[in-house]
UniProtKB/Swiss-Prot annotation:
Known EC number: 1.14.11.-
Domain of life from the UniProt record: Bacteria
Keywords for the protein's UniProt record, in alphabetical order: Dioxygenase, Iron, Metal-binding, Oxidoreductase, Vitamin C
Chain sites annotated for binding 2-oxoglutarate: 167
PANTHER family: PKHD-TYPE HYDROXYLASE YBIX
Domain Fe2OG dioxygenase: 78-176
Protein name according to UniProt: PKHD-type hydroxylase Shewmr7_0698
GO MF entry, a single one: iron ion binding
Amino acid sequence: MLIEIPNVFSKEEVNQLREELDARTWIDGNQTSGVMASTRKRNQQLDKDDPVVLRIGELIMARLLAHPLFVSAALPLQFYPPLFNRYQGGETFGYHIDNAIRSTSDGMVRTDLSATLFLSEPDTYQGGELVIQDTYGQQSIKLAAGSLVLYPSTSLHQVTPVTSGERTAAFMWLQSMVRDEGQRRLLFQLDQSIQALTAQAAPERELFNLTGVYHNLLRRWSEL
């Protein structure tokens, strides 16, 4: 399941974030790569321990945890804190699958979901599409600055070469309360239906029944 979430940050907020990020020191992006991915990866990143990275990462996580669509789709349990990358001058990241486990200062994170928050407007660079292969085929993603795409970490994906301009983004992984992607999809569809019926003032009894089904399935499938 691939979910696009528009306008996580406004254009003005993105400009402020970019001003801070662009002023930092960018380094070789292979610091977060596995052995196989490192042979396919050519980009730049900010140091994960940079205080600006840590502060903006906290801001991004807080914004996502307050976003109903993100919470409904991801059922987040734990983040691997956001990192930031930049592509320019033909830089690319060939097809790969993200590492299953990431280590943080608080322990280990199973990467159930990956997310990219775009911080460059799509008309300011050529190439740089996030191409994801999933059960529904191949999808090419290039969103407006401030928008985010969420997708299963099991997906084969790549960033195509940036042939002109500059593509800056935040990327992150998270562990969901529900490990299985199919179960998460069913819960998301059920939750979205409940929200739509609530907005249409559907009869309370039916809403109570559906809400009960949702929470009982979440109780059965969640791992905390």
